């Protein structure tokens, strides 16, 4: 057994080895005599063989050596969330109960949580007992166990309460690591890399070379760490020795020890927010990169060191950005909580700070810290580094008069050098290589294909490439290239040379979203013509590509169009020496684009030993011999001439001087001519030697425009030229840059659009741009979101120059995009040009939370799914135009579709259909409903267009109905072209396409009557309002409830649903309890539920078995699909279980749209008491994922469990909490819960036993009995009121809901009496006001609702804050009118766009308001006294009101009439004559449904009702309906509850 010992604080107390459990036991018992030894670990560790062996050995050895001593063990739950005061106290209580004294020796066996917390226990128990650290994770071995720092966490931060307490021994047994999962091993490597980065470059270099072997071993199906134990021991020792040395020099962290906190200032802040999902090492890894970038920003650390650190961490599988795909998946929705203010707040309470000053360790180079101490850093600098947007402040006169800038290596040369070196034989040292995203992707790809071995020297400045002579092999991993266009083109050609392996037969190249739009077809065509087999995996002509290995490169003559990108030409040139036959490459069709880049490639091939000869007989034709590149010993990459244009342009714009010391006239790069060909004619002084270039700008405001400049030799530099031209005198026209339209973005359009924000006019030409310069004083500061960079590095850098010339700071989005070619550009701007930068955090709105506004909506679905009808309704509802794409196609082609299909076939029709879809999405992107044909999803291209539309935030709505009904309908419809397949087969084929192309789904219930159609129209309108964001669920200010439906098939209980749900605020659909969980069945159930409970929000729940439901826990993918389908159905609320995988949680949260989220957790065992930290963690998790509500359900075993819950509720208020206990003893919790309490109903007979469910009535009765509800009194006031039905209505509802309220009459015509005798009573609950007090009562109201103000009358009074803040006057008469029409299916009424009000009194005003709310465009007025009507017209100036004259009465179109004249008095003959004309002209028939509402409820049938119904067949609504509907609205205002409609209706009618 080999054991390495490390001295710390003068004592060799750190022992490192492999399989040293026996040594741990012997040393502890021999050296640390004690009556009691206590092994403390966690419940996970205790199950491992290594722990069991240690405990058994200790027991046996103790019996031999110290038989009088005893061994105790104590286990705590695992995880950082248990490293707290409570757990520490539990451990201490255990020690006290066991009679432990000051001679006790504690062994802390576990990871950092155990080491930290048990070390702190040892430090404080009996004022300090001895402790032995036995770290079992890599992280704890190299970090927390060494140095005596012990602590626990609090809610305010990590490790804030603790002590320095040195362990007697630290035993690092590397064999313990065998028990760790892969992620935990990787996690530990962060601290290892950190230690080497701050202290020992030699060790850092060793770690770089060890990464591949380490990752391969721990990733094996059955890892065997013994095979790498020597390297692992070296790894642990390397870190431990550094930490021991530092601790020995600075035990209490006074100075030097602070260096160990590199990466922790930012890393700890990130960890505090992302724990427990993100691990310590992962956060420190990201923190190291951010702090290294901070050092670079401050001009201390070279960019190459940042790149090297980044590459090393990534090589170990550690995240280097929170945006990394895998890390983002792990942390899920918590990523949204990484707000800069929150992070800085966490940094401000870091232990190593000096007061409120943030201190941070700055790296000077790999292996060395700046000035060997932590430095004060400013929040402003952190903000720049931590955010991806930046404000560029005016340059003013802060910049130096002259400066020398060395840009990073040329991207073009760097990428070519890496390809040539990888294909070559031998080792080459590449200096000044560009360290950027592009070259990182290139390096990673070369290594993945085993084309070369890559290492670093000179602190990362030199890249050592050992080429394998063109021997490349297929790899399993996808090669991800981000948005690296150069890398994608070069590697596509290189991949054609790849050989297959036993397991892998192809190479896949992919990239980000923009890369998957960029063209590569011309290169792929050339390769496939030459024998390669390349498949497009997504969009034709773009990445991702699958390239079959082993086909080789045939060679011979290859022709490419001269207009082809020079990168395609270079790709083939560089691979040509490895073809089977010598290659002749001919560029045909004119002068090649970017000839200089082709010349560059040929010159570099020569440097690597291959001579390309130019044909003497054919223009633009090259002969490439078969050969193998020979790598030169050293290759120096020239600085990037395109990047050099930015500092040179800075000088031009600011009347300063800038020198680029390593780019001159001898450069191979076309952009090296920028200074001479562009800046000099614009008025700059230019001095250029063969190796350097200096530009001095003219006096500010004197730059001259360039009338004509062909920038074809330096196309990338046109953006820089454009921003200089923007402030030059005159118009500049740039040509020869057509290829810039297909770069990272359409750069020409981008320049036109973004220059406009600065007040600079520019327009596109056929192959360039024309810019009309402005005076500096006329340059505008872009408002709003500032400059959009389109994820294009050159757009960002160009506009960072123009931004500094504005009067105010300018926002630049996506600043990190410059990492493509110049990662340190912002650092140069800040530290070299003294520009003031300010980081800005864009707070993104929830995905989908924006209202749809006027954006067009696309409709898809099968034939006969109701697309025509529902599209028409949708257009009406949104006031959009309806465009039927089939009709548009017929009009465009001047042919009937049926005939078109018959003559030219379905394929031709589909092709034309696709063209029309793309055209309409482009032309009619706003204010339209685009209704498509059923087969739009048959083609890949239209499917892609639809999916892209949803990705961009547009709505694609899939309409569907019962398939049998669809079949029945289509079989009877001769007007449509016949399907060639069976309809059901067509549906089966298309179903998955409809789902993947749409982001919303609406199921239409089958309608057989006008009433059902009217209801469907109402349901559909509500659905549309939800998905467009116009009407989303809002939590009531009062107590709220939901009722749960547990039926397997709602079709069997439709009437029951309405009765049991109407008094709740939402209805829960338990999807897991349905008869089956097929999406079609669920859609049907939701459709039915919506049709029955039209006004109620739907809570969509899929509960797993472990959470008291029926859905299988193991079917995570099925759960994800069901939740996503719920979102697609546009449900109001969705229940998201907190035990779901982080990826499921993240997807639901990110795609929630306008659906509210309940984050839920259930414990039906009763083992978790409410003072257990697990509940706190679950609540915090719900908060962290940004759920709208958190629902936590426990099981009450005692009555006191309810009191513990209430204490928990008081302490956790960040998000609304639904907190209840199940079980009979938990009923009190349901009574006390205020937010969305689950309730049952008296009519539900099959209630679950033992759950403790209560009805709303039972809850209210119990709440009254314990003082939670107080008695209240309500009155109807006015005169006469003795026959009012209001008391009957309200008292019936109180009784039904168990409310301790009383409603009575108060007869008076004196408002003052009402105020003094009723409204001042402590039990006052509210008033129903009738004549003659509707106007007089207003003076006693401190507030009036908008409806009361406009109508001018109050019929409802409620106290504000129990009357302490006065009284609210409202009007519910208009709601009574509007809801009476709605309940009578007004949606299908003819001429609904126009209404008529008969009468001129107070109720007429409410009628006008109601008709307007129902969407009547014009409202006619009719009364005996026309002067009264003019007063009404004047009172509603914004409404289209018209007094109905006798001559027009028989000709106007009217669908809704409200009669507001007394029902028990004779009517004026003239008025009746006019009314007769209206009724006659609009009488009902089979197609029309005109409606008349009688406002008077006495007598039951009035003369007007009789005339309308009997003579003209109008549907009449008696006044009693208005009374009930008005009372229902009034009841809700008074109590906050919804009245049971049947109950109040019956109470009013049964006099």
From Swiss-Prot:
Residue segments, region 3-dehydroquinate synthase: 1-379
One annotated Gene Ontology cellular component of this protein: cytoplasm
Active site (UniProt): 253, 268, 1162, 1191
Xref: Pfam families: DHQ_synthase, DHQS_C, DHquinase_I, EPSP_synthase, SDH_C, Shikimate_dh_N, SKI
Ligand binding (7-phospho-2-dehydro-3-deoxy-D-arabino-heptonate): 127, 143, 149, 159, 191-194, 243, 257-261, 264, 280, 351
Region (EPSP synthase): 392-835
UniProt subcellular location: Cytoplasm
Binding-site residues for Zn(2+), renumbered to this chain: 191, 264, 280
Pathway annotation from the record: Metabolic intermediate biosynthesis; chorismate biosynthesis; chorismate from D-erythrose 4-phosphate and phosphoenolpyruvate: step 2/7; Metabolic intermediate biosynthesis; chorismate biosynthesis; chorismate from D-erythrose 4-phosphate and phosphoenolpyruvate: step 3/7; Metabolic intermediate biosynthesis; chorismate biosynthesis; chorismate from D-erythrose 4-phosphate and phosphoenolpyruvate: step 4/7; Metabolic intermediate biosynthesis; chorismate biosynthesis; chorismate from D-erythrose 4-phosphate and phosphoenolpyruvate: step 5/7
Record-annotated membrane-spanning stretches: none
Protein known as: Pentafunctional AROM polypeptide 1
Originating organism: Lodderomyces elongisporus (strain ATCC 11503 / CBS 2605 / JCM 1781 / NBRC 1676 / NRRL YB-4239) (Yeast)
């Amino acid at each position: 057994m080999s054991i390495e010992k490390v001295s710390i604080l003068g004592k060799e107390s750190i022992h490192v080895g492999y399989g040293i459990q026996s040594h741990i036991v012997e040393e502890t018992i021999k050296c640390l005599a004690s009556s009691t030894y206590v092994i403390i670990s966690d419940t996970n560790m205790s199950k491992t063989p290594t722990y069991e062996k240690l405990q058994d050995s200790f027991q046996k050895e103790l019996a031999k050596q110290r038989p009088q001593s005893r061994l105790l063990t104590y286990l705590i739950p695992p995880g950082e969330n248990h490293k707290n005061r409570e757990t520490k106290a539990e451990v201490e209580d255990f020690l006290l109960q066991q009679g432990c004294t000051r001679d006790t020796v504690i062994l802390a066996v576990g990871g950092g949580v155990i080491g930290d917390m048990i070390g702190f226990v040892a430090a404080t128990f009996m004022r300090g007992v001895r402790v032995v650290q036995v770290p079992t994770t890599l992280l704890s071995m190299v970090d927390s166990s060494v140095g005596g720092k012990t602590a626990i966490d609090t809610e305010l931060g990590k490790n804030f309460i603790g002590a320095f307490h040195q362990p007697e021994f630290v035993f690092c047994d590397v064999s313990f690591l065998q028990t760790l999962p892969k992620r935990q091993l990787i996690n530990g490597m962060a601290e290892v890399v950190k230690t080497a980065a701050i202290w020992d470059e030699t060790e850092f270099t060793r770690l770089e070379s060890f990464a591949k072997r380490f990752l391969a071993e721990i990733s094996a199906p059955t890892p065997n760490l013994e095979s790498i134990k020597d390297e692992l021991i070296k790894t642990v020792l390397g870190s431990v020795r550094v930490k021991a040395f530092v601790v020995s020099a600075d035990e209490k962290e006074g100075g030097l020890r602070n260096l160990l906190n590199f990466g922790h200032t930012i890393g700890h802040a990130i960890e505090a927010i992302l724990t427990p999902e993100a691990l310590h090492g992962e956060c420190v890894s990201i923190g190291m990169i951010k702090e290294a970038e901070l050092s670079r920003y401050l001009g201390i650390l070279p960019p190459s060191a940042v790149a090297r650190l980044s590459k090393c961490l990534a090589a170990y599988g550690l995240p280097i950005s929170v945006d990394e795909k895998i890390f983002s998946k792990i942390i899920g929705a918590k990523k949204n909580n990484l707000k800069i203010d929150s992070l800085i707040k966490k940094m401000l309470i870091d232990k190593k700070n000096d007061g409120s000053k943030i201190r941070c360790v700055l790296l000077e180079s790999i292996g060395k810290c700046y000035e060997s101490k932590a430095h004060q850093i400013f929040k402003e600098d952190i903000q720049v580094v931590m955010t991806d947007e930046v404000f560029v402040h005016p340059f003013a006169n802060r910049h130096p008069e002259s400066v020398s800038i060395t840009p990073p290596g040329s991207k073009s040369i760097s990428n070519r050098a890496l390809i040539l070196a990888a294909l070559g034989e031998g080792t080459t040292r590449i200096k000044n290589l560009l360290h950027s995203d592009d070259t990182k992707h290139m390096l990673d790809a070369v290594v993945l294909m085993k084309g070369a071995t890559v290492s670093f020297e000179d602190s990362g400045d030199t890249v050592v490439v050992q080429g394998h002579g063109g021997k490349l092999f297929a790899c399993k991993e996808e090669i991800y290239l981000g948005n690296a266009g150069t890398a994608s083109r070069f590697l596509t050609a290189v991949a054609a040379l790849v050989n297959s392996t036993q397991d892998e037969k192809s190479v896949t190249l992919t990239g980000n979203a923009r890369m998957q739009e960029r063209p590569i077809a011309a290169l792929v065509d050339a390769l496939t013509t030459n024998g390669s087999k390349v498949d497009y995996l997504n969009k034709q002509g773009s990445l991702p590509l699958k390239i079959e290995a082993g086909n080789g490169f045939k060679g011979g003559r290859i022709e490419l169009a001269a207009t082809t990108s020079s990168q395609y030409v270079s790709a083939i040139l560089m691979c040509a020496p490895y073809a089977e036959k010598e290659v002749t490459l001919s560029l045909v069709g004119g002068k090649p684009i970017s000839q200089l880049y082709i010349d560059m490639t040929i010159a570099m091939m020569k440097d690597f030993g291959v001579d390309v000869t130019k044909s003497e007989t054919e223009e633009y034709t090259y002969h490439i011999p078969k050969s193998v590149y020979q790598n030169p010993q050293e290759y120096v990459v020239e600085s990037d001439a395109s990047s050099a244009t930015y500092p040179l342009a800075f000088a031009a714009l600011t009347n300063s001087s800038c020198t680029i010391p390593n780019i001159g006239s001898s450069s191979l790069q076309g952009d090296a001519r920028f200074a001479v060909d562009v800046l000099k004619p614009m008025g700059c002084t230019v001095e250029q030697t063969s190796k350097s270039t200096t530009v001095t700008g003219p006096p500010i405001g004197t730059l001259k425009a360039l009338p004509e400049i062909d920038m074809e030799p330096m196309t990338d530099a046109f953006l820089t030229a454009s921003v200089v031209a923007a402030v030059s005198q005159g118009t500049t026209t740039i040509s020869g840059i057509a290829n810039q339209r297909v770069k990272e973005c359409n750069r020409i359009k981008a320049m036109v659009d973004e220059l406009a924000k600065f007040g600079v006019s520019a327009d596109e030409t056929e192959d360039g741009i024309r810019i009309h310069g402005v005076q500096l004083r006329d340059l505008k500061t872009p408002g709003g979101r500032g400059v959009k960079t389109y994820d294009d590095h050159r757009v960002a850098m160009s506009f960072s120059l123009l931004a500094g010339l504005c009067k105010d700071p300018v926002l630049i989005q996506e600043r990190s995009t410059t990492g493509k070619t110049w990662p340190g550009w912002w650092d140069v701007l800040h530290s070299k040009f003294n520009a003031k930068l300010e980081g800005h955090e864009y707070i993104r709105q929830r995905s989908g939370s924006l209202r749809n506004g006027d954006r067009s909506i696309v409709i898809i679905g099968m034939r006969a799914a109701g697309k025509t009808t529902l599209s028409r309704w949708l257009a009406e509802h949104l006031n959009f135009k309806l465009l039927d794409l089939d009709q548009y196609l017929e009009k465009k082609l001047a042919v009937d579709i049926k005939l078109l299909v018959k003559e030219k076939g379905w394929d031709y029709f589909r092709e034309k259909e696709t063209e029309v879809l793309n055209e309409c999405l482009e032309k009619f992107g706003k204010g339209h409903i685009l209704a498509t044909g059923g087969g739009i999803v048959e083609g890949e291209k239209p499917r892609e267009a639809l999916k892209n539309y949803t990705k961009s935030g547009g709505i694609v709505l899939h309409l569907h109905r019962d398939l049998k009904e669809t079949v029945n309908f289509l079989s009877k419809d001769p007007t449509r072209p016949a399907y060639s397949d069976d309809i059901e087969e067509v549906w089966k084929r298309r179903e998955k396409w409809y789902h993947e192309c749409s982001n919303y789904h609406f199921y239409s219930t089958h309608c057989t009557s006008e009433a059902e159609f009217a209801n469907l129209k109402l349901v559909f309108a509500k659905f549309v309002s939800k998905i467009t964001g116009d009407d989303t669920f809002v939590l009531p200010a009062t107590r709220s409830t939901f009722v749960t439906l547990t039926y397997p098939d709602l079709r069997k209980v439709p009437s029951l649903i309405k009765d049991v749900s109407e008094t709740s605020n939402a209805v829960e659909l338990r999807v897991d309890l349905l008869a089956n969980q097929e999406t079609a069945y669920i859609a049907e159930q939701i459709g039915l539920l919506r049709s029955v409970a039209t006004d109620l929000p739907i809570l969509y729940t899929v509960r797993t078995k472990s959470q008291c439901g029926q859905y299988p826990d193991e079917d995570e993918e099925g759960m994800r699909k069901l939740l996503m389908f719920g979102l697609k159905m546009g449900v109001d609320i969705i229940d998201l279980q907190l035990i779901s995988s982080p990826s499921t949680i993240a997807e639901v949260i990110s795609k929630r749209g306008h659906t509210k989220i309940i984050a839920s957790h259930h414990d039906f065992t009763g083992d978790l008491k409410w003072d257990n930290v697990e509940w706190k963690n679950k609540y915090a998790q719900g908060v962290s994922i940004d759920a709208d509500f958190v629902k936590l359900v426990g099981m009450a075993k005692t009555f006191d469990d309810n009191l513990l819950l209430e204490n928990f509720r008081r302490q956790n208020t960040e998000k609304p909490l639904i907190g209840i206990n199940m079980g009979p003893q938990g009923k009190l919790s349901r009574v006390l819960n205020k937010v969305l309490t689950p309730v049952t109903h008296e009519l539900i007979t099959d209630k679950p036993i033992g759950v403790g469910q209560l009805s709303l009535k039972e809850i209210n009765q119990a709440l009254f009995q314990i003082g939670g509800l107080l008695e209240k009194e309500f009155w109807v006031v006015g005169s006469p009121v003795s026959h009012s039905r209001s008391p009957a209505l309200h008292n019936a509802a109180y009784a039904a809901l168990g409310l301790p309220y009383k409603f009575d009459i108060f007869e008076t015509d004196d408002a003052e009496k009402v105020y003094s005798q009723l409204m001042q009573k402590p039990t006052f609950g509210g008033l129903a006001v009738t004549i003659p007090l509707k106007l007089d009562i207003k003076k006693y109201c401190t507030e009036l609702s908008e409806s009361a103000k406009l109508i001018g009358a109050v019929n409802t009074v409620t106290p504000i804050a129990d009357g302490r803040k006065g009284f609210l006057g409202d009007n519910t008469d208009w709601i009574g009118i509007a809801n009476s029409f709605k309940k009578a299916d007004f949606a299908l009424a003819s001429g609904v766009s126009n209404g008529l009000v008969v009468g001129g009194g107070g109720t007429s005003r409410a009628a006008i308001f109601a008709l307007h709310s129902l969407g009547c465009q014009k409202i006619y007025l009719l009364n005996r006294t026309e002067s009264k009507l003019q007063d009404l017209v004047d009172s509603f100036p914004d409404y289209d009101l018209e007094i109905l004259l006798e001559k027009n009465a028989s000709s106007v179109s009217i669908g809704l009439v409200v009669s507001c004249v007394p029902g028990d008095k004779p009517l004026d003959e003239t008025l009746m004559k006019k009314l007769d004309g209206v009724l006659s002209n609009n009488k009902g028939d089979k197609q029309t449904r005109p409606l008349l509402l009688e406002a008077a409820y006495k007598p039951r049938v009035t003369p007007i009702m009789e005339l309308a119904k009997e003579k003209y067949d109008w549907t009449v609504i008696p006044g009693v309906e208005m009374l009930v509907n008005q009372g229902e609205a009034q009841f809700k205002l008074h109590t906050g509850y919804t009245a049971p409609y049947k109950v109040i209706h019956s109470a009013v009618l049964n006099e």
